[in-house]
Each structure stands twice: as C-alpha cells, then as structure tokens.
C-alpha cells in the first residue's frame, strides 16, 4: 500500500507537457446553453392526466402509434451505396419492361458434376487419404494370418470375436 496518496496524484502524467502534446485544447462551455421553449406538463406525480388537457375521443390512452404498432415498416435507408447496388437497380428496371421469354435448357456439359463424380464421399472422421480412390487401388490386400485367427478375444480385450482387431500385414 502506498504511504503517500493524493486525490490528483495521477493527473500530472496526463498533463500536456508530460505527454509531449503541444496542441492547445479546445475550449468547451462549462454549462450547456438553455433551450428556448418549454415542456408542457400533462400529468401529476402519480401519472394521472391533469384537468384541462385535451383527451382523445377514441381512446383514453391517446392515439400515439409506436414503431411496433405501425401497419407499414419504416423505410430502410441504404447507407452503403456501391457500384454493384446501382447496377443491380438498373437491371431490375430493365427487367421490369415487357420482353420475350427465352426458354433455357441446361446443356449436357453443364450438368451437375456431383452425379458424374467418381470420388466417393468419405465419412467425417476418416482421414483425407483413407477414402481416396487412388490410395485404395494402390493398397496391398492383406490376408489374415493363422496367428491372427488363433488370437482369442480375451487376449485382445475385445467383448466379441467380431470386434477383434486384425494385426497389420
């Protein structure tokens, strides 16, 4: 704990001389200037509307329509005006004009590549090299050895003989 404490002990480090900041600070008003006009008080401290305040004939709560009560949502202002947005708007205007419809049929060259693809989908937990077709044809085929067949499930600590893991070739 410090032996010396001052209420403004850290103020000196933020002094313009210490920060080597030679700009003259902007002068701000100490208090804001008063506004013209007044606010009309329409209710008392308990929230009851005062006498003499005109009330709505349709609703005792007034006819104020909030944002969520509006029938139509407020307009969205587009703050980002890009070239793509203006081109898109021009295309929409052009497409609004009547024109002949052209029947389009997909060409055989642009058919979906997923159907014709020879690569098989691999499971999620498999490594990328396990499911590749080139790797599968290059792998040598292992035949189970008689030693692997004679291993009991108890030695493998496997619950059933079907789940026993074969030894690598």
UniProtKB/Swiss-Prot annotation:
<dbReference type="GO" id="GO:0044782">
    <property type="term" value="P:cilium organization"/>
</dbReference>
<dbReference type="GO" id="GO:0016324">
    <property type="term" value="C:apical plasma membrane"/>
</dbReference>
<dbReference type="GO" id="GO:0036064">
    <property type="term" value="C:ciliary basal body"/>
</dbReference>
<keyword id="KW-0966">Cell projection</keyword>
<comment type="similarity">
    <text>Belongs to the Flattop family.</text>
</comment>
<dbReference type="InterPro" id="IPR038797">
    <property type="entry name" value="Fltp"/>
</dbReference>
<dbReference type="GO" id="GO:0005929">
    <property type="term" value="C:cilium"/>
</dbReference>
<dbReference type="GO" id="GO:0005737">
    <property type="term" value="C:cytoplasm"/>
</dbReference>
<protein>
    <recommendedName>
        <fullName>Protein Flattop homolog</fullName>
    </recommendedName>
</protein>
<dbReference type="Pfam" id="PF22611">
    <property type="entry name" value="CFAP126"/>
</dbReference>
<keyword id="KW-0206">Cytoskeleton</keyword>
<keyword id="KW-0472">Membrane</keyword>
<feature type="compositionally biased region" description="Polar residues">
    <location>
        <begin position="119"/>
        <end position="130"/>
    </location>
</feature>
<keyword id="KW-0970">Cilium biogenesis/degradation</keyword>
<comment type="function">
    <text>Acts as a regulator of cilium basal body docking and positioning in mono- and multiciliated cells.</text>
</comment>
<feature type="region of interest" description="Disordered">
    <location>
        <begin position="53"/>
        <end position="169"/>
    </location>
</feature>
<keyword id="KW-1003">Cell membrane</keyword>
<keyword id="KW-0963">Cytoplasm</keyword>
């Amino acid at each position: 704990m410090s032996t010396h404490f001052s209420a403004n002990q850290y103020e000196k480090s933020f002094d313009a001389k210490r920060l080597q900041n030679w700009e003259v600070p902007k002068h701000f008003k100490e208090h804001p200037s008063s506004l013209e006009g007044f606010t009309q008080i329409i209710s008392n401290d308990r929230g009851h509307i005062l006498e003499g305040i005109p009330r709505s004939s349709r609703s005792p709560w007034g006819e104020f329509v909030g944002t969520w009560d509006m029938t139509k949502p407020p307009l969205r202002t587009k703050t980002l005006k890009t070239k793509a947005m203006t081109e898109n708007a021009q295309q929409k205007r052009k497409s609004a004009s009547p024109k002949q419809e052209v029947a389009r049929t997909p060409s055989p060259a642009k058919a979906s590549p997923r159907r014709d693809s020879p690569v098989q989908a691999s499971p999620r937990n498999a490594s990328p090299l396990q499911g590749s077709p080139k790797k599968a044809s290059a792998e040598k085929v292992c035949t189970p050895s008689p030693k692997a067949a004679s291993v009991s499930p108890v030695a493998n600590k496997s619950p059933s003989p079907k789940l026993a893991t074969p030894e690598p070739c």
